[in-house]
Amino acid sequence: MFGFLNVYKPVGKTSHDVVAFLRRVTKIKQIGHTGTLDPFAEGVLPICIGKATRLIEYLEDDKAYIGTFCFGKSTDSFDIDGNIVETFEDKVAEDDIQSALKSFEGVIEQMPPIYSAIKIDGKKLYEYAREGKTVDINPRKVTIEKIELRSFDYENQIAEIYIKCSKGTYIRSIANDLGKALNN
């Protein structure tokens, strides 16, 4: 058996959890996904089965996300699961978000989060982070084809942002960088 399958990945599961479940249920060992979704993210996880896994490296199409960004605090992992490293009293305005988003369109340099599966010297970054070790991380070029504010709750400082981007883009890094651009 071979082919492609779009699977809904719920919050709280890793992309690997989904693959492991499918391997167990189908009794097929050759199963892989086309890109990792963070455990706190939910959405469609494209799966390749059997000989289709050989095509994963050729699936370079853009990806689209809707992210929920919370202003007023910064975490070490750039997401809600991380430890808060800084808080901000001032609220951001919707117009300021709209203006700042324009600087993210096109080819940008993005610093991956320390809590990520990117490997340096054969070891995943999150392994270094959990050990409390610092490593030099190089920024990566990514393309943001479209980024737009869908909604904004001023009182709670929560924005819903649509992003169409190249493979390898970290939405968490965009959230962190947007916060920095807004001094928040």
Per-segment meaning from a language model:
Residues 1-184:
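Catalytic/RNA-binding core of pseudouridine synthases
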